[in-house]
Amino acid sequence: MDRRIYGGSAVIHLFLFFSVLIFSAASALSKNQSPSSGSGQINSNSVLVALLDSRYTELAELVEKALLLQTLEDAVGRHNITIFAPRNEALERDLDPEFKRFLLEPGNLKSLQTLLMFHIIPNRVGSNQWPSEESGRVKHHTLGNDQVRLSNGQGKKMVDLAEIIRPDDLTRPDGLIHGIERLLIPRSVQEDFNRRRSLQSISAVLPEGAPEVDPRTNRLKKPAAPVPAGSPPALPIQSAMAPGPSLAPAPAPGPGGKQHHFDGEAQVKDFIHTLLHYGGYNEMADILVNLTSLATEMGRLVSEGYVLTVLAPNDEAMAKLTTDQLSEPGAPEQIVYYHIIPEYQTEESMYNSVRRFGKVKFDTLRFPHKVAAKEADGSVKFGDGEKSAYLFDPDIYTDGRISVQGIDGVLFPQEEEVVESVKKPVKKIVQPRRGKLLEVACSMLGAFGKDTYLSKCR
């Protein structure tokens, strides 16, 4: 009996020991996994969910376009955040249209991300934590590694130059949102816009492709790995034989022989890929490849030794085309033919020509129509009146054979006025028949043998 009780107590002690050991291991494992689980998921009470469902619809739309949701989710998982949300009117009507178009271009995704991160502070700053008038301005670092200054003066809470109009508008456990009256623009984004508007950043620098977005994950694709040193060249030696942009404008060389030293199809494919990576010219590339066979025709011309300059309208200009303008048979081909110049021109060469001669007419592949160009507002303007277009994106692609210049409108040839010549009735002038009466009289007198009576009949 005693042995049974002793053995039973030993089993109970052993069971309690293993229970305590398993419980301590489970608690330690839960402690180790708690930070990762908090940073990996966002609950429905998050400040990000509140932003997407709030009155600040314009800001929420920009955050989605800038692909910042994953970045903000990671930031909320690590710490609280404070968002300064501009009102919708500040982004719809008060913002410069050119600046807004600059932000929405695919090639300026980094500038848009920097602008939005400038409105977010990686800690919690409520209205009760605002600096007083005596303390002056207090600097806070943003998620974009910039600094914003919080101040309080004349009863108004300010963040930089924007007034807080809705303090503590949305409050959540992981952050809060303040409503502000205007958009905050960091200095770096303003400088990028000024360089772009003055064409300084693209006048003498090779264009870089716009960031590529993976449609499956809605995230940026990783750039390709750099080519190792000593690897064979990516382009054939014939590409080095082509004249550079410094020689433009130059007449087209004569057709090549049967060897076809220039791979025109590869060059056309290269410039179409450049259009797609540059961003904003997808419609033009779609017409060249899918709607028409112009890409193949251009490749044959380049292979034979000819050079081409393409005036490529951007997507906004192509969207203004009506269905009637594209539904007629051969209409897309005729539109593109009018935008191809059979000579090599760069932005510099065309601008120098219009500055020197005032107005220059370039031949097009839509014979016999020509496209007129002149200098306007420090750039090159094509066409006249409402059907005009400005050279908007210079030197998108220049390889010595094909030059692509971006314009902000679709060009159409001027309609020829047919002047119908009206035939006026011609009045017939009856000439007098002189001497007929005298001739008849002489013949009658001659019949009677008395024509000698008149001296006129002799």
Curated annotation (Swiss-Prot):
Main location: secreted
Pfam families linked to this entry: Fasciclin
Record InterPro entries: FAS1_dom_sf, FAS1_domain, FLA15/16/17/18
Keywords: Glycoprotein, Proteoglycan, Repeat, Secreted, Signal
Residue ranges occupied by any FAS1 domain in the UniProt entry: 43-184, 268-411
Signal peptide: 1-30
Coiled-coil features, chain-numbered ranges: none
Biased composition (Pro residues): 225-235
PROSITE patterns in alphabetical order: FAS1
Residues covered by region (Disordered): 207-262
Sugar-modified residues: N80, N290
Localization of this protein: Secreted
CC per GO annotation: extracellular region; plant-type vacuole
Function as written in the Swiss-Prot or TrEMBL entry: May be a cell surface adhesion protein.
Similarity section: Belongs to the fasciclin-like AGP family.
Name by which UniProt lists this protein: Fasciclin-like arabinogalactan protein 17
Species in which this protein is naturally found: Arabidopsis thaliana
Gene name as annotated: FLA17
